[in-house]
UniProtKB/Swiss-Prot annotation:
Optimum pH is 6.0-7.0. Residues 1-26 form the signal peptide. Pathway: Glucan metabolism; xyloglucan degradation. The active site is at D273. Belongs to the glycosyl hydrolase 3 family. Its EC number is 3.2.1.21. GO terms for cellular component: periplasmic space. GO terms for molecular function: beta-glucosidase activity. This is Beta-glucosidase BoGH3A. InterPro entries: Cellulose_deg_GH3, Fn3-like, Glyco_hydro_3_AS, Glyco_hydro_3_C, Glyco_hydro_3_C_sf, Glyco_hydro_3_N, Glyco_hydro_3_N_sf, Glycoside_hydrolase_SF. It comes from the Bacteria. Its main location: periplasm. SMART domains: Fn3_like.
Amino acid sequence: MIIGIMKTFLLTICFLSVQTGMVAIAQDKEQTPVYLDDTQPIEVRVQDALNRMTVEEKTRLSYAQGKFSSPGCPRLGIPELWMSDGPHGVRAEINWNDWGYAGWTNDSCTAFPALTCLAASWNPLLAAKYGYAIGEEARYREKDVLLGPGVNIYRTPLNGRNFEYMGEDPYLASELCVPYIQGVQKNGVAACVKHYALNNQELWRGHIDVQLSDRALYEIYLPAFKAAVERGKAWSIMGAYNKVRGTHATHHKLLNNDILKGEWNFDGCVITDWGAAHDTYEAAMYGLDIEMGSYTNGLTSESEFGYDDYYLGKSYLKMVREGKIPMEVVNDKAARVLRLIFRTAMNRRKPFGALTSEEHYRTAYEIATEGIVLLKNGTGKKQPALLPVPQGKYKRILVVGDNATRNLMLGGGSSELKVQKVISSLDGIKAKFGDGVVYAQGYTSGRPMYGRADVIPQVTVDSLRNDAVEKAMNSDLVIFVGGLNKNHFQDCEGGDRLSYELPFAQNELIEALLKVNKNLVAVIVSGNAVEMPWVKEIPSIVQSWYLGSVGGEALADVLSGEVTPSGKLPFSYPVKLEDCPAHFFGEISYPGDSIRQEYKEDILVGYRWYDTKKVQPLFPFGYGMSYTTFEYSKPVISAQTMNTDGSIDVSVKVKNTGKVAGKEIIQLYIGDEECSVLRPVKELKDFRKVQLLPNEEKEVKFTIKPEALQFFDDKQRTWVAEPGKFKAYIAASSSDIRGTVTFEYIQ
């Protein structure tokens, strides 16, 4: 009896406790502001927060509070945003008010290969892995916005920042940036796609005024940004330094209001490049949402707490109070910043991230090995192929070159990285080929300084060259590892290359080495094409890139044949600089007259120019050799006509006819045979990367839709596909056509 009473009593207590808890939870739910309730849709939360904020709080969201931070709304418990460079790795911590490094001991990162290497891989699956891995590192470091990827088009090989971008073709850049962005943002970190738009040179980047046609703008320079927004769903965009048609790009009505936020329905934030804003009214009215700055007032001085002096600081608030800036503009800006904060800093469902994990190093290795491009490998009996280099074949291997030992993560401007580990080219080659490897520096390039370059004494140049030549005489194989580096006036932010040739007397060194040893493999480390006056004399040439933390291991595995090279060039290699379309028209086209420049080549950028003008490049776009060979069947088309709502399939069989496994990149180009306006001979519209074992054959099918036939009609301001005949090219590169089919488009 007593036991029964006790049970009843305990059950009653439990029931009352549960009821009380449920009531408390319900009350808490009712008391939680909507903007803090992450079960609510983001747009509902944004509107609720806006309704609670003062004008001062709304405008304060739009400018920096530190070098890499912008504020939230402390009164409402809305946190600040933290940003970080860059597209290849998460940059070490920077001081609050200056550009000095903070000296932390826990901010080392994985250096991933530069984006030119990713572009050379032609592998969207790797782009997704890249984005997710770098996003994990940013998340672990508690960053909300990762300042990348860069998708500016490769217009000239002199651009100091080409290594950060994805080549000359808008379709290739689009297909790779989308999975990269999606990968980053799965971590609750915003990708900030840059530099919007037309920041295609570093020289005079802060003020050069770009003049171009609407066709060039829409067909060449905007597609990757459009893909980033519409397909990648990028949460932020970085405005560029340069002017476009007289107005700074970072607050530009056509670019930001009409195209980005109008035509593409972008709902994220436009963030300045650091110090890129120049006018309060334009910044407010023409689409800028967050202003960041190189200096604490955004322009000139190093005052300690001058953030209110930014163009979107107190001047912006004053204009709002005076009625010069409508409140709908203020609310739109604030809503965009809040939306970004809710997606990142206030996203409680984001993962914890990871830093310098083995998985990240493996991803970096895969990108590096798939991006390395074999440019040349013998020409026959008189010049036999030197690659791959079997282990044990050569007793003495000489590695020559400053880049073989240089830490190529240093320098370059905002892409500079502090890495946990780095495997240099020499380290990788020694680990692969053993004690028979010796080293000679051969040349020196000086310190990786920003804004200036070391002057190398001639006595040093001669001494290093003589030492390398002497060692080459007594070596069985010479591997030259040279090219460019991250020094100023090379592959570096803030300045362009001064010439197309290799710097630091490398051409003279290569010629001297060839005179004493013909068994020479040249490995060119760069993010740009370089002049090669010795190209016919060297048996084997490899285009390496800035390969990141484990680049030396990746390079050694490709040289040895453990990995078969499968990269293909994401840009054309001109024989001489004047062959490049940006340079064909003289200084007004590049670099401009210091105030203004005209893109006179119009839509004929890269291979579009070489094809149309019948100029032979040194190495064409989409080109890359392998240690195996591939045979293409005759392509088959599914129909001879296509209507406005139809499509056509083009199929081709590809067979590995060599003795080792390899990967081939099959490229589809489309040419308009009958058009009322100038169009290139052909344009890349699709590609596939397939892996094939020896004697294995696979069928690749491409589906062509009317969108692939279109050009931008600048009179109607719309995309148009004119009826008529079209040709589909199946190719191994833009110059290596393996088959064609024709069809007619009918409206």
